[in-house]
Design a protein with these regions (language model features):
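Short, flexible, solvent-exposed loop/turn segments with mixed acidic/basic and small polar residues
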Residues: 1-3, 36-41
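Charged interaction segments
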Residues: 21-32, 43-100
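Short, extreme N-terminal segment that most often corresponds to the first beta-strand
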Residues: 1-25
Length: 100
């Protein structure tokens, strides 16, 4: 299955993006991470995508490491950093989707 993870960071700093990207790849090295761009969701923030081939079971394991309280099912879920514990404090928003 194809997994896509949309990430919004509450920073527009290149070093912060690189730090979070490194942490994300430590959680799941098979992610292919896109370059970042200015976020349309949040001021002074950046967004990027990470994609991978992943099983539903492995996706659940990875999601549990990225955030402690997802809204939705494993194949379509979101999390916000203001009311949950993210894998990095700079992560403002995550959206994960699985496709057959």
């Amino acid at each position: 299955m194809l997994g896509t993870l949309y990430v919004v960071l509450s920073s527009s700093n290149e070093e912060d993006y690189q730090k979070v990207k490194k942490e994300l790849l430590e959680v799941y090295p098979d992610f292919s991470v896109s370059p970042y761009k200015e976020s349309q969701m949040e001021k002074d923030a950046v967004e990027f995508f990470a994609t991978c081939q992943i099983t539903k079971e492995k996706a659940k394991e990875v999601l549990d490491q990225l955030n402690n309280d997802w809204d939705g099912e494993v194949d379509d879920c979101i999390a916000y950093g203001f009311n949950t514990k993210m894998f990095d404090s700079l992560v403002y928003h995550l959206n994960f989707q699985l496709y057959d």
